[in-house]
């Protein structure tokens, strides 16, 4: 099934049913009085997290959804039937955003969680409601209120404990195959991974964590180059980042330079994301001699001025992967314990999560705006400003032109 992680839809709640104007008419009862009933409320629109879904592809081609309107009231004080609510299933991890205001309406992070996105219209009143001591035969009713309508943007972020970062062909997919039952495609050419992959890593009998593998980043990714920039948002909810570096690149490149490239692009995309706990993992160590391995390890650490945890592994040979997974599980357990026992630590992590979400959304929205301008044949404000500055410099060199009416 095609992986779609971002869609725009329109939702419309049902209108309320109109009130009824009716009078009681029975044999031997001349003036029965009003008996018009109220209309029914319109149906509302809900989004519900479904753990069996992993993509928003169902909303790629069908984008308009309307709930049922309420029925009008009946005679004999009968109330109209309420419109049926419309429940739209979405994957767990979906963020709902109002397209008009860019306000986050809610996050669906638990299976079965529901979110009201459009409230049904209020019912109209029948003429019975307007009966009084001075108006015994009212001919007044009210129509039902229109249901709420909204343009929504749905963003899916996969829910994973650990996220993998790295250039194409750094061995991220091989790593996830080595430590879990996931089988993403692996090949010796760049951009083999086109969509995020998830793998569940079992540590012992009762413990496990989820790893997310996204397409590799390249130089200029923060400006929209390559595939990985669109999927970096999936790392926003991870608890730990593993920065994989190829120690023996096929093109003979510099591993330290490759690591610096990832850090630069990460900083451009979201400075807050660089503050997430990040471990350095040097992969493909089996392709190097011991002396060369130590030399390249030292070069990477010196170039990055790295102070955090470092692991040298071979995902293909499963060398060093078990110890790495054990340490990851220990870190996640310790992190959960601190969140439960230290309110300040929990609040700091929550604030960091909010910063990452905001920066990722702002960056991706800017890229979308630039893409829309290019398609329309227009230029961004910065480009136009640069052109204006260039023209101002040239104004003094050319002939002075007077426009005469």
UniProtKB/Swiss-Prot annotation:
GO cellular component entries: cytoplasm
E.C. numbers: 3.6.5.-
A Pfam family per the record: GTP1_OBG
Residues annotated for Mg(2+) binding in this entry: 173, 193
Signal peptide: none
Keyword Disulfide bond belongs to the record: no
Superkingdom classification of source: Bacteria
Entry GO MF terms: GTP binding; GTPase activity; magnesium ion binding
Segments traversing the membrane: none
OBG-type G domain sequence ranges: 160-333
Region (Disordered): 127-148, 383-405
Localization per Swiss-Prot or TrEMBL: Cytoplasm
PANTHER family per record: DEVELOPMENTALLY REGULATED GTP-BINDING PROTEIN-RELATED, MITOCHONDRIAL RIBOSOME-ASSOCIATED GTPASE 2
Subunit structure: Monomer.
Protein name listed in UniProt: GTPase Obg
Species of the source: Azotobacter vinelandii (strain DJ / ATCC BAA-1303)
Phylogenetic classification of the source organism: Bacteria, Pseudomonadati, Pseudomonadota, Gammaproteobacteria, Pseudomonadales
Designated gene of the protein: obg
